Structures are given as C-alpha cells and as structure tokens.
Amino acid sequence: MSRRETTQENLTCSFCGKSQEEVKKLIAGPAVYICDECIELCNDIIAEELKMEETLGPDLKKLPKPREIKDVLDEYVIGQEKAKKVLSVAVYNHYKRIETSNKPGDVEMQKSNILLLGPTGSGKTLLAQTLARILKVPFAMADATNLTEAGYVGEDVENIILSLLQAADYDVERAQKGIIYIDEIDKIARKSESPSLTRDVSGEGVQQALLKIIEGTVASIPPKGGRKHPQQEFMKVDTTNILFICGGAFAGLDSVIQQRIGMKSLGFGADVKKRAEKKLGELLLNVTPDDLLKYGYIPEFIGRLPMLATLTELDEDAMVQILKEPKNSLVKQYQKLFELENVRLRFTDGSLVAIAREALKRNTGARGLRSILENSMLDIMYEVPSQPNVKEVVISEEVIYHKEKPIVVYEQQVSDAA
C-alpha cells in the first residue's frame, strides 16, 4: 500500500502524506483529506501573494475615474462637494501622469500637489486618508508645527519620507507612489511679508526645506530615522511621484482676502453686514496665490502646490449628517459596540441635534462630536456590560444637555409589552 493511500484504519493527508496521528486535525473532502499543517501553509502562500500584489502599488489600469473616487469620498465625508471634486480630479491626473511618465517620447507632465484650506474639523485629514484607502497606496501624515530646517532641534523634513517608508513596510518602490498629508501647513508661514534677516527655523526655513521633496528629489533616508546613527546605511527614495497634500485652517487669511476684495474692516466705512454674512469658508473660496504670498509663503512654495481646494465650515445640518450617515459614522460605531453586548442603541433626532449644537459651540468642527458622545455615554457604557438583562438604550437630548441618564429598557419590560 502506498504512503498516500488512505484506509479506514489509517487516514493520511492527500497533500503531505502525514497520518492522522501525526497531525492535529485531518479534514475530509470528496475522496481527499487535508491536514491543519497544509491548510496553514496554503494560507501563508495566499497571504504572501496578496502582499506581493499590494507591493506593486495602485493598479493604474484599474485606476478609478474621478466620479468613482468622489462616490467613495461621499460615503465617508459629508458636504464639501467642490473640494471632493478638486481632489478626485487631481488624484486621478496624478496617477495617470505616473502611468504615462514611463513611456518614452510622451509629453512630460508636472506633478500637481494639493493645498487644502478650511476650518478645524471640516474634514481635511479624513479626505486625505480616504483617498489613500481608495487607491490602496501607502499613506503618511505629518504635523508641520514639529518640522524645522536641518541643523536645528526638531523633526527633519526627511522624517516625513521615513514615515511613508514605514507605512510601505520599507518597500521603496511602493513608497514612491504613496500619499503624504502635511497638517497645520499654515503654521510655517513666515512671520512677515518681507524676507527675514534672521533665521526663522519654523517658518521660511521649513518652507525651503520642504521645497525639494515636494517637487521631486532623491532623498537619503536612514532606516531607523534621525541623525544619531551616522554609520547606518541610507535608503534612496525618489519623491517625484509621491503626492503631497497640505492642509491648514489659515487663521487670519480671511483678513488678507478682505483687504484685496475691498471689504473694509475698520473705520466709518466698514461694511459690517457683508463681513458678518461672509463666513471664513466662503472667504477662502476667493483665495489667490497673491493672498498666500502676503500671508507669509515664499513664491516657490506656493508654486509647488498649484491645486487649491477650499473646505467650508460645517453647519448644524451637516453635523447631524456626519453623526449618522457616513459608512463609519459615530452613531453606527456606538451601535456596533452595544450590539456586541446584545443591546440595541437608539438616538432620538433631538439628541443628534443637541450633539451637533454642542460641537458648534466648541468651535472644533466634526472633531468635537466624539468627545461629546464619550462624555455623555460614559456611565451607561460602564454599566451595560454588567447587566445582561438590558435590551435597549435610548439617548435623548436631555442626556446631552442636562447629563440625565439614558432610557434603559430591560428584558422583562419587553416581555410584558409583548
């Protein structure tokens, strides 16, 4: 009898030939058997192949069209229609440019990095993260306030590339097609319009340091980061095809725009009504490169970010939509948490309006929604796991406004009602 033959007395794996005594589990199929070790090996092979496919970066032949990109953005980001269109077109053109850049004789197209302008909590970071998820490319985020030019205490701009490299599991080829989002970019505007005679290591100096990597250069990146290990081997990363998205709230830029379009802010001629009617987001829609120059950016830096997308402030209706409509909305997240305890969680319409109004009072945009919910629901989330007879929890506006306890429906009450 051959080794692979199986009998009722001695069953063996049809793939590796091990007997049922030699393995933990033997699974039977139509005339074949497979052991747990072969199943594990198959899983490893499949996982490795999937990882190899991801390593190739975005499949440019299957690159989603601008409309398809926006449709997915709509699932996660409420409102901001103009900004989503600008981003969808810019990202599509960016990766099409990469596809054609490898063909000899083609017109050389320059990279169009993106500048997002909008109030805190309006969705800038979420838009950038969602784009990277749609395209399945490595994504890294940096805070411009931590950056300094080389030679000063702080974070080197090269560390941004290192973060992207880490997100790509140190696969240089994949990292070179990634997306980097630099937040708080408004904080590196120089302190005055005229060039500084003294060093401005967190302003103009950082702009100069960012210029090369944003436009495209071959950066030498230490795998472990920092300048403390000069003996380690550097990795070469070409930033030419990395898409840079920079975002900021740009406090004070509205005044620059107002001056340009003739809206007086002081004196007897002040147009108070017009100024009050125009919100920050609406004013930012009128921004020009000259406004950014006056705000404190050097001309070369403005030139590296040719695509401008403005996000407007979120109103009460938008906040309520953000709470319940996106795929990963806060309401859906909390309902899932309670569902794991076999409890139904319900929010009244009034409670959602109350949460939105509280967030607007804090002036933190959509970012404030989670903290309001966490504070309002802390006690009930503490109690419910210890009460297996709870069937439903109802959050009303009184819970949000007056810190009252939520309505709790118990199993006995459900039985009595039936």
Swiss-Prot record:
Name the UniProt key words of this record, in alphabetical order. ATP-binding, Chaperone, Metal-binding, Nucleotide-binding, Zinc
List the SUPFAM superfamilies hit by this protein, alphabetically.
Glucocorticoid receptor-like (DNA-binding domain), P-loop containing nucleoside triphosphate hydrolases
Q: Which Pfam families match?
A: AAA_2, ClpB_D2-small, zf-C4_ClpX
**Transmembrane regions:** none
The segment(s) forming the ClpX-type ZB domain are 1-54
Coiled-coil annotated residue ranges, if any: none
Locate the residues binding ATP.
Answer: 119-126
Give each disulfide bond as a residue pair: none
List the GO terms this entry assigns under cellular component, sorted alphabetically. HslUV protease complex
| Sequence positions that bind Zn(2+) | 13, 16, 35, 38
Keyword ATP-binding attached: yes
GO biological process terms, alphabetically, are: cell division; proteolysis involved in protein catabolic process
Q: How does it assemble?
A: Component of the ClpX-ClpP complex. Forms a hexameric ring that, in the presence of ATP, binds to fourteen ClpP subunits assembled into a disk-like structure with a central cavity, resembling the structure of eukaryotic proteasomes.
- Family membership: Belongs to the ClpX chaperone family.
Q: What is this protein called?
A: ATP-dependent Clp protease ATP-binding subunit ClpX
**Organism the protein comes from:** Pelobacter propionicus (strain DSM 2379 / NBRC 103807 / OttBd1)
